[in-house]
């Protein structure tokens, strides 16, 4: 897959600061398995997938209005949350 540029993403998001917020929230969803990728994975990491989804117009700033899912997905997450039942 060709590289994703900031300019490709800015066609679908208002500014670069909002792009950081949208991409980071989406990458977190993908990394935790909360959401399925909307583009071909092509062995990309969650951050690249998030940017590719934004550039393709599949993810918009509306993601910022979605509630956070508080799923602990690793023993580190559980340890940091204070849940020691693992």
Swiss-Prot record:
Q: Which InterPro entries does the record associate with it?
A: DNA-dir_RNA_pol_omega (IPR003716), Pol_omega/Rpo6/RPB6 (IPR006110), RPB6/omega-like_sf (IPR036161)
Does the record carry Repressor as a key word?
Answer: no
Extract the signal peptide range: none
The UniProt entry's GO CC annotations, sorted and at most eight, read:
DNA-directed RNA polymerase complex
Any Pfam family = RNA_pol_Rpb6
Q: What is its EC number?
A: 2.7.7.6
Q: Which UniProt keywords apply?
A: DNA-directed RNA polymerase, Nucleotidyltransferase, Transcription, Transferase
Recorded GO molecular functions are: DNA binding; DNA-directed RNA polymerase activity
Q: Which reaction does it catalyse?
A: RNA(n) + a ribonucleoside 5'-triphosphate = RNA(n+1) + diphosphate
What are its GO biological-process terms? DNA-templated transcription
Does Glycosyltransferase appear among the keywords?
A: no
Q: Which family does it belong to?
A: Belongs to the RNA polymerase subunit omega family.
Q: What does this protein do?
A: Promotes RNA polymerase assembly. Latches the N- and C-terminal regions of the beta' subunit thereby facilitating its interaction with the beta and alpha subunits.
NCBIfam families the UniProt entry points to: rpoZ (TIGR00690)
The protein's assembly and partners: The RNAP catalytic core consists of 2 alpha, 1 beta, 1 beta' and 1 omega subunit. When a sigma factor is associated with the core the holoenzyme is formed, which can initiate transcription.
What name appears for this protein in its UniProt entry? DNA-directed RNA polymerase subunit omega
Organism, per UniProt? Psychrobacter arcticus (strain DSM 17307 / VKM B-2377 / 273-4)
